[in-house]
Design a protein with these regions (language model features):
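An acidic-aromatic substrate-binding cleft motif
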Residues: 276-292, 363-459, 463
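Conserved small/polar residues in nucleotide/adenosyl-binding loops
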Residues: 511-515
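Extended, loop-rich substrate-binding clefts of extracytoplasmic carbohydrate-active enzymes
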Residues: 76-136
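C-terminal motif of bacterial Sec signal peptides marking the signal peptidase cleavage site
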Residues: 15-16
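Ligand-binding face of N-terminal immunoglobulin V-set domains in extracellular IgSF glycoproteins
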Residues: 280-308, 314-318, 322-372
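Acidic, glycine-anchored loop motifs typical of Ca2+
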Residues: 489-501
Length: 516
């Protein structure tokens, strides 16, 4: 039996499907992307228009045997763009079915710089070509280039061959870098410098891992193998993790100075495994089910897959053996974008125990049916997620320090009319007695970080404290697994201190809001 992963709520797992055999050419389909069996090439189906500039889900993308392994295909202004580096606007996108091409206009308003990227099907490959009607602006010469990014987790440890020279993608970020004067740094988001140069007035610039005109990526892994060649431009391979933990491997060609017309051309040929069909993706409750509730699994299928008429429920017995306890028919739900969906109702399974779903040769991981499955679902959030986000506190867990006491030096008054990155802004008036950039005493108390980083969103803190208060008023959760000492500015996870945790969380947020 094969084990298939669960379908997590809120996650959109993209995958590939195509024709009937490995000899099929890439075609431009009615959904306006190129496809063959096992390969999809998307051309600005997703644009650089999110709230965080470079969100690793834009530009030219490749979905390769069920995994989006490549993205970010665009004219960019640095070797390994970071989150707050400038991204191009895409004022137009033209799909030409007759020519089997998609053309996207790109523009950097800050530099009055326009380009066009044209992707055209050529057999099992696509040509990616960059066109310029005007030469690269002088201030961007040597910086403007065409980039394509590769997901590190899918390639590290795998081989690549550049112009016949064998090499391997590194597991860790270990390539070479240089530093350059800040005066040579291309402008970042809204003109801000989003890196810390430690007073050196220099920025870090990664050097390429390899350079050549032809690269075969992952020849040792057919599901990830891609051949890329260029007759007119050097291909330079970089490791974007040298500058950002969420950086990807980057293949890049510099746009030549002083030229117009077609200035860069790549031939990109992703390998396709013969008769590949994406495995079924079986969705069910990860929490489990109470005996009396409806129980319906949703099974997501490759459009080339043939739905099975039945699925089964197996129970895991006390001795570790398994037994089929229910078999029922599946029912068609319909198509949604790339996939076909069927449903499997097993509501009549009510006996408490450990179970899994079997669909054809695929089995899921386990789930539990019991009256108490919802009793502890908030414990991980309450015991770990919330306290590790406490600002202005040293947070410890056993032998691990999550973070020291942040922002001990306090905060400065933002200048009027300041539009900072990450949603922070100051209007034309400060409405305080403090001058621009003057230290404001007493602000470095309480509060919680924004999810995933170390800033504070006051609006979010207000919303969360309201939810905490509502939870306390309705349910009075008495769980106490967190030690909080305001005096010591110290938090220790999994250590009771005699006070319900939720009351301490309310106090943290209220203290912060009152100080503001």
């Amino acid at each position: 039996m094969k084990r298939t992963s669960i379908f997590a709520l809120g996650a959109l797992l993209l995958a590939s499907c195509g024709g009937n055999d490995a000899n099929q050419d890439l075609v431009l389909n009615d959904l306006e992307y190129f496809e063959r069996q096992g390969v999809n090439v998307l051309v600005y189906s997703n644009t650089f228009s999110g709230g965080f500039n470079d969100e690793k889900n834009s530009g030219i993308e490749i979905i390769h045997h069920g995994v989006r392994t490549v993205q970010g295909g665009a004219v960019r202004l640095s070797n390994t763009p970071e989150q707050w580096d400038l991204v191009p606007a895409s004022p137009s996108r033209v799909v030409n079915k007759e020519n089997k091409s998609i053309e996207v206009a790109l523009r950097y308003n800050d530099y009055d710089f326009d380009s066009r990227v044209v992707v055209t099907a050529q057999g099992k490959a696509v040509e990616i070509a960059v066109y310029l009607d005007e030469p690269v602006p002088a201030e961007l010469e040597g910086d403007a280039g065409f980039n394509l990014e590769f997901l590190p987790s899918q390639y590290w440890g795998k081989a690549y061959i550049m112009d016949g020279r064998p090499n391997r993608f590194p597991r860790y970020a270990v390539s070479n870098t240089i530093t350059r004067p800040n005066s040579e740094k291309v402008k970042q988001y809204k003109g801000y410098k989003t890196y810390d140069d430690r007073g050196t007035d220099r920025f870090v610039d990664p050097l390429p891992l390899e350079t050549g005109r032809s690269i075969l990526i992952a020849p040792d892994e057919p599901s990830r193998m891609i051949k890329i060649t260029s007759e007119d431009s050097d291909l330079m391979l970089y490791d974007g993790r040298m500058l950002a933990q969420n950086g990807w491997f980057v293949l890049r060609s510099i746009l030549p100075a002083g030229k117009t017309g077609k200035v860069v051309s790549w031939i990109v040929e992703p390998n396709a495994i013969e008769n590949w069909i994406r495995e079924p993706n079986i969705g069910f409750s990860q929490v489990g089910y109470v005996p009396s509730q409806p129980k319906v699994a949703v099974i997501e299928l490759d459009k080339k897959d043939k739905p099975l008429a039945k699925a089964s429920i197996f129970k895991v017995n006390d001795d570790g053996s398994t037994k089929e306890v229910f078999s029922g028919k599946t029912n068609a739900w319909g198509d949604y974008f790339k996939y076909h969906y069927i449903k499997f109702d097993f509501t009549e399974v009510k006996e408490p125990g450990v179970y899994f779903i079997k669909y054809g040769e695929y089995v899921t991981n386990n789930f539990i049916i019991n009256d108490d499955v919802y009793d502890k679902i908030t414990d991980a959030t309450s015991d770990v997620w919330i306290p590790i986000h406490m600002n202005h506190m040293f947070v410890n867990e056993a032998y691990r320090v999550w973070h020291g006491e942040p922002f001990k030096e306090g905060y400065l008054q933002a200048p009027p009319s300041t539009d900072h990155f990450d949603l922070h802004s100051q209007g034309p008036r400060t409405d305080t007695k403090y001058k621009a950039l003057e230290h404001i005493p007493g602000l470095n108390v309480g509060g919680f970080f924004d999810a995933g980083d170390f800033d504070i969103e006051t609006g979010s803190n207000i919303g969360v404290v309201q939810n905490f208060v509502t939870a306390w008023e309705l349910f009075k959760p008495m769980r106490d697994e967190t030690f909080v000492s305001q005096k010591q500015r110290y938090v220790d996870l999994h250590r009771p201190d005699g006070t319900p945790d939720i009351l301490q969380y309310i106090d943290r947020k209220s203290t912060r809001l009152n100080s503001s």
